Structure formats: C-alpha cells, structure tokens
Amino acid sequence: MERDDGGGGGLFFRGLQNRSHEKTKLRTRKSTLYLSPQKSTGRCGDLGENIYLVLFIIALRICNCFLVQTSFVPDEYWQSLEVAHRMVFNYGYLTWEWTERLRGYTYPLIFASIYKILHLLGKDSVHLLIWIPRLAQALLSAIADLRLYSLMKQLENQQVARWVFFCQLCSWFTWYCCTRTLTNTMETVLTIIALFYYPLEGSKSMNSVKYSSLVALAFIIRPTAVIPWIPLLFRHFWQEQRKLDLILHQFLPVGFVTLSLSLIIDRIFFGQWTLVQYNFLKFNVLQDLGSFYGSHPWHWYFSQGFPAVLGTHLPFFIHGCFLAPKRYRIFLVTVLWTLLVYSMLSHKEFRFIYPVLPFCMVFCGYSLNNLKTWKKPALSFLFLSNMLLALYTGLVHQRGTLDVMTNIQELSYNNTNVSSASVLMMMPCHSTPYYSHVHYPLPMRFLQCPPDLTGKTDYLVEADMFYLNPLKWLYMEFQNDSQLPTHLIMFSVLEEEISPFLISNNYERTAVFFHTHFPESRTGSHIYVYERKLKGKLNQR
C-alpha cells in the first residue's frame, strides 16, 4: 500500500486511493470475471468517478451556492437572469448592450428554460427564480471540478490529482464565483471540461470534436473565451500529423454548427440576423470602448489582479512552476498569454482572468505534492486563509444590494396599495438586481449609465449628472408631487446631502441594510429605504 505522505487527505482520500490500487490489480491480472464496474468500483456513470466523490463535490457546491449571499458585479443579474425573465414573462429591463446587440441570447436561454419550466409547473415564486439558476450553475461547476480531478489522474496519478483537487476546492475566488450566473463562470466551466478532452500527453479521454465543440460553445457565450485557447489550439495544430483533416473534418464543421446555432437563437429573439460575437469583440477589443466603465494601468493584472485572484495560492503556484514537468509548460504559456492580452485592454476586472485559475491549480497541486516537512502546515494555511476570505466575501462584503431586494419583494406582495407603489434607486447604476429578483411589474427606476457611442466630448450619463448635485437633480426631476415615487433607495453617504428634499416631501426611513465595511465615494456602508407619508400615515405595506 502506498504511503500517505500528506496525512491531511484523511480517510476520504485514502479510501479512494485503496480503490484505485484495487483496480490496478485487476487490470494487471487481465481477469475477465470483473466486468461490472458499477459494482466493483462504485463508479458514477459518465463522470467516471467514485460515487461518493461525486456526491461529495455536488453537496459541497450546493453548500457553496447557499453560502454566497453577496453581489459581485452587475452582469450576474443584468446580462443573464434579467434577460431570461424578460424572455419568459415579457417584462424586465434590457441594458444598452442588448439594443446595440453586443450580447447573445444563448446563455440567458439556459435560465429562460428553467423559468419556463417553473412557470408551467406553477412554481415560479421569486425565491425559486433566484436560487434555481444558481443551483444549476453550481452543478455545472461541480462537473467541471470532477473533470479536472479525472484529468490529473490520467496525466499523473491519484496523489497529484488529489492535491490539485484540494487546491481547486479551497480557492477563495472559485468559491466566490463558481455559483454565480456570470458568463465568466460558464466560460470557466466549459474551459475545464474542454481541457479534459484536449490532446495532452498521457490523456486517455482526448477527443478533438468534443473539446473543440466546448471551446466553440464558450466562444458564442463569451467571445473572449477564445483568448486562453489560442496557445492550446496552435499547439494542437502544430503537433497534429493530419492538419488538413483536423481543420476540414473537425474544426470547421464544429465552428459552423455552433455559430449557426448562435445565429438562429439570436435571430429568434432579436428579430433580425446579427453576429453578436463580432459586435462584442469590436466594442471591447478593437475599439476598447469598455474603458468607459473604468481603466487601469497596463500592469494591473500582474501587480494586483492575478495575485488577488490566486490569493494565498500564489507562492505555491510559483513553486509549482519550477517543479511541474515540461509538458505542462503549455498551461503556463496559456496563463501568461491570457494575462498579457487582457493587459492590453484598458478596462480590467478580476473575473476576466477567472478561466485561467484552474490551470494555476495544476501547479499549486504539484507544489503541495512535493512538500515534505511543511505539508501539514501548508494545507492548514491554504484552507484557513481561503475559507476565511471566501466566507467573508460570500456572506458579508457587498450584501446590502441583495438584501434590499427582499424589502421590495415585500412591497410587491404584502402591500395593499401595491398598484400605487413605485421605487427610485438613487445609487450607482445597476447596483442592485431588478425584476428578476422582484417578479412583479412594480414601477421602478434606476440611474442609467449607457456609454457614449457618438463621440461627444462633454457627454454625461444620468448617474453622473445626478451625483454632480443630487439635491438639485431631485427638485428638477420631481417638480410635481404626483410624480414622486413612494419609495427611495440610497446608500448612506447620500442621506445628508438630500435631507432637505426628504424632509420637504415627507419621506421617512423605514429600513436599513448593511452593505460593506469598505465604503467608497458613491457607495456607503449601509443602504437606506425611505417611504413617503401620505395624509399623515406611511404607505401601507
């Protein structure tokens, strides 16, 4: 029996190890008596892993889903759930990206299908509309985790695979993102599963059609998903003996089918033929207009973004880069290439480099596998540091913008005067979800911020105009009392500045929600809900 160097894997991993060795014995004997893998190895169908491991990772990602109760970026609602809600229930807000056809309907269609099924079953409650899509994303992430583990078992051995698996599961950023309804999350899931079928030396699951289909699907969901795959595709093409056959009989048919599927889906919902992938790349890459939403120095990913995403895995990643076999250089090239390409774009975000995180976990796993004296302290350090950060960012930091939506839900469903209720969100645009988290056609308004596509030098969005002089904006916007909303939602930093308007129009604070310990200029530590008095009484709830 192989010695357990780490001691930190526990009975769970040792049980898996024993099963793996038992299978090796049977293979050596070439016995024909053991032809029932489901009985002898406890494998779970197409996933090809021990049933207990499958159940464990599914349970973990479900717990992960419910332990992430904070907001990250607006796109996880506005570019997925909000669009799906409009597709099924005929109300919901489409941002400017959809009028300009920069986004495709392929990804929202997944959630629209879920919404439609819930609607047909009469189970389309607001809570199910919020949580079922996230649980679906969690299950997809669990499948990706299993594929990464299976791949490393094929390429190396179970001992290396379990350390890569451990690093993947305890990564704070993976925990933070993998259950969110972001295109970046789906991009990462598809990248991992595609890597399982990619032709690597030692892989037993290589399949060019399957991996290229998954890459193509990732591309039509988020066109920049092709960036990490450029080095991998070139490597495959370079090493392939039948290059013409690879292109004509595999890549081109796969690309044609997936792109045609995307065109048909978008034709149905846009009402005209459009190639959203080209529009997306033109806006974000060729024209670099994403800088409207903020720009960073060229080195940001190397100096801040990548270290923050890796967190305490960073020293193990660096260590593993020196230890991993040469055949994994392509993974390192993929990571560096992706960072370099994204560094050339002005607008930078942590989530953009999420798809290369699994590649980094391979090197982190190698580092742990080669540690001897310090293995147990290293495991404890990695687990505790990542889980503390994961729980804080998942349960505490930036939770107010989701919590306040429960207040609006109550306003919609428990208010006898709901027909006269209305809401104005005086916050940076897209701070909160919208109708996907209310599921009622309540009149709501937020401060808009579409970018200038005409080239005006003095262009100001509504949100910027508001924050130049909030009090003046309110008095100019609501000169007639009949136009006043019944409810105002704002960050705490705004309250003092607009207090004359609140007092003169009989608004009273009715709810307070904690948001963050790190307030910024327009984002306060708390969110306030104000309700307008009518005839000496507060609006009834």
Swiss-Prot record:
Glycans are attached at residues 18, 417. It is an enzyme of class 2 (transferase). The chain crosses the membrane at residues 53-73, 126-146, 182-202, 214-234, 245-265, 305-325, 330-350, 352-372, 377-397. The keyword GTP-binding does not apply. Pathway: Glycolipid biosynthesis; glycosylphosphatidylinositol-anchor biosynthesis. The keyword Translocase does not apply. Alpha-1,2-mannosyltransferase that catalyzes the transfer of the third mannose, via an alpha-1,2 bond, from a dolichol-phosphate-mannose (Dol-P-Man) to an alpha-D-Man-(1->6)-2-PEtn-alpha-D-Man-(1->4)-alpha-D-GlcN-(1->6)-(1-radyl,2-acyl-sn-glycero-3-phospho)-2-acyl-inositol intermediate to generate an alpha-D-Man-(1->2)-alpha-D-Man-(1->6)-2-PEtn-alpha-D-Man-(1->4)-alpha-D-GlcN-(1->6)-(1-radyl,2-acyl-sn-glycero-3-phospho)-2-acyl-inositol (also termed H6) and participates in the nineth step of the glycosylphosphatidylinositol-anchor biosynthesis. This is GPI alpha-1,2-mannosyltransferase 3. It comes from Bos taurus. The lineage of its organism: Eukaryota, Metazoa, Chordata, Craniata, Vertebrata.
